[in-house]
Amino acid sequence: AIIKPKYQLTYEDANEILELEPKEEVELIEIKNLLEKSITFRKKQGAIIFESPNSKIKLYKERVVLNKLEKTISQIIVAESMILMGHVTSLFIDKYNLAAAFRIQKLNCKPSEILNRYDDSDIKYIILKQYMGRSYITTKPGIHESLGLKMYVQCTSPLRRYLDLIIQ
């Protein structure tokens, strides 16, 4: 198949469209609504949704500088679409008993215990990340607890990750 995009949509353009919701852009709005349902589903399954902004901490002239980078709606839907694709792909692989590298993660704590213990949202998510178990790869499907999914594969970045290329 040959894909010929009509125009390039930047993150900024997408954010503006998703904020204004013009009738001409119904497809993008429908995609956002679908992915919001995916997030809601994962939350009900115990997913940890990091709602705090991404922070970059740097040491500059013996001072610690903290830059907070707020997540935009377009970044959230791109991330969620990648997660959804990985989940749907894992279901397909499992259904047809295909060989694949499943990503599994077990949590070393109950997230609610940490999230309820601290008031500062930045601190709670930093501490929570320390208690989360590392994900690992196996050939058998299993739960990815922090994503709230019964199975998951990474498959959306074949140029950056060789396993994604194999799965594709």
What is the role of each PLM region?
Residues A1-Q168:
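Electropositive polyanion-binding surfaces
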